[in-house]
């Protein structure tokens, strides 16, 4: 699919100040280094400023300060990256869904499917499920009993919703994601694990995005809950009973253990692990590969990772870490000797 828009149309859509030809035709988007005639680019990170002067793009999204002295066409905006995000959808080549149910789909008699929904090949929709207006469900998806998929939802091929999953409006779920699988619940009886039925569900708010091969387990008793605007990257594990607050984002390979509660507007970087039954307050940033073992009660940035260094240096550091306990004991002994010498053998005023 090829889309062509004029620079003037894009300026109007963004509320941008136009510098250059209003009639200039734009056919796509590209980076500053790769853009050519007909393509629009953007400068959002100052480290790429060096590519601007030699950029071959038809036009560039710029802040006012960067537009000064720039000889080419520009759309001047307060936030070039946000402007790029907004117009990226205008040039998205993703095929548009067509309303209707594919003949190979299996839909339970009592399931409700809105006439405007698109149900792809070999989809299974089980008893009591409800599919809202303008929903797109890709090939080989399974929608379990009594599930609800809200208006404008988009499920890529091979998404699985177990029974009793409720999804809000405009939710995007990528291929391989499994929502509502049984949580990891077992009771130990004299060394033997006895399974606990997971009788809760999953509730997902509006405008949530869930990445490829991410798993969100159903609750043991009450629902696992993901609030409005949450963004989950690929290969994330959300265990049973977890609660995630509005507009929190998690990068790939995060693991959240059962019954942990995460607040609003948090950013959890890649590979973070959180133990179960802890609380994380609003507005927290956790750096990549951090292991969170206790509740976080104050907003701010947190890390437990070790920064990269040359291997030989890291080995020396690791060896010193093993010696810390012994070094601490030796330091305490040295402090006692210094105390004795400086006090003339008499007890100090501190005891």
From Swiss-Prot:
Molecular-function annotations in GO: N-acyltransferase activity
Catalyses: a UDP-3-O-[(3R)-3-hydroxyacyl]-alpha-D-glucosamine + a (3R)-hydroxyacyl-[ACP] = a UDP-2-N,3-O-bis[(3R)-3-hydroxyacyl]-alpha-D-glucosamine + holo-[ACP] + H(+)
- Which family does the entry's similarity section mention? Belongs to the transferase hexapeptide repeat family. LpxD subfamily.
Give the source species. Answer: Pseudomonas putida (strain W619)
Kindly report, in one word, the top-level EC class recorded for this enzyme. Answer: transferase
Q: Provide the taxonomic classification.
A: Bacteria, Pseudomonadati, Pseudomonadota, Gammaproteobacteria, Pseudomonadales
Cystine pairs: none
Its EC number(s): 2.3.1.191
How would you summarize the oligomeric state and partners of this protein? Homotrimer.
**Biological-process GO terms, alphabetical:** lipid A biosynthetic process
Q: What name has this protein been given in UniProt?
A: UDP-3-O-acylglucosamine N-acyltransferase
Pathway noted in the entry: Bacterial outer membrane biogenesis; LPS lipid A biosynthesis
- Supply the alphabetized keyword list: Acyltransferase, Lipid A biosynthesis, Lipid biosynthesis, Lipid metabolism, Repeat, Transferase
Q: Which Pfam families does UniProt cross-reference here?
A: Hexapep, LpxD
* Residues at the catalytic site: 240
Q: Which CDD domains match?
A: LbH_LpxD (cd03352)
The free-text function statement in the UniProt record for this protein reads:
Catalyzes the N-acylation of UDP-3-O-acylglucosamine using 3-hydroxyacyl-ACP as the acyl donor. Is involved in the biosynthesis of lipid A, a phosphorylated glycolipid that anchors the lipopolysaccharide to the outer membrane of the cell.
One Gene Ontology cellular component term attached to this UniProt record is:
membrane
């Amino acid at each position: 699919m090829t889309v062509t828009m004029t620079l003037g149309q894009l300026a109007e859509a963004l509320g941008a100040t136009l510098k250059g030809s209003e009639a200039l035709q734009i056919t796509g988007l590209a980076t500053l280094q790769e853009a050519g005639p007909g393509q629009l680019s953007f400068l959002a990170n100052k480290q790429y400023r060096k590519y601007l002067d030699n950029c071959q793009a038809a036009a560039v999204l710029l802040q006012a300060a960067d537009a000064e002295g720039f000889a080419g066409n520009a759309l001047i905006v307060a936030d070039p990256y946000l402007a790029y995000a907004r117009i990226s959808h205008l040039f998205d080549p993703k095929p548009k869904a067509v309303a209707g149910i594919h003949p190979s789909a299996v839909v339970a008699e009592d399931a409700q499917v809105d006439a405007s929904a698109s149900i792809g090949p070999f989809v299974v929709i089980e008893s009591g499920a409800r599919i809202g207006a303008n929903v797109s469900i890709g090939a080989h998806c399974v929608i379990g009993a009594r599930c609800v998929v809200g208006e404008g939802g988009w499920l890529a091929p091979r998404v699985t919703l177990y029974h009793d999953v409720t999804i809000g409006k405009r939710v995007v779920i990528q291929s391989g994601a499994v929502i509502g699988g049984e949580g990891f619940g077992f009771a130990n009886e004299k060394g033997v694990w006895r399974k606990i039925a997971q009788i809760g569900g999953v509730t997902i708010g509006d405008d949530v995005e869930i990445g490829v091969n991410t798993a969100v387990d159903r609750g043991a008793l009450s629902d696992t809950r993901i609030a409005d605007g949450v963004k989950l990257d690929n290969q994330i594990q959300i265990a049973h009973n977890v609660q995630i607050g509005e507009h929190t984002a998690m990068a790939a390979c995060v693991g959240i253990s059962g019954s942990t509660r995460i607040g609003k507007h948090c950013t959890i970087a890649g590979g973070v692990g959180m133990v179960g039954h802890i609380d994380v307050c609003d507005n927290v940033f956790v750096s990549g590969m951090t292991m969170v073992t206790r509740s976080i009660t104050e907003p701010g940035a947190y890390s437990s990772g070790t920064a990269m260094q040359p291997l030989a240096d890291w080995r020396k550091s690791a060896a010193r870490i093993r010696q810390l306990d012994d070094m601490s004991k030796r330091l305490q002994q040295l402090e006692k000797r210094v105390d004795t010498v400086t006090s003339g053998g008499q007890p100090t005023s501190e005891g």
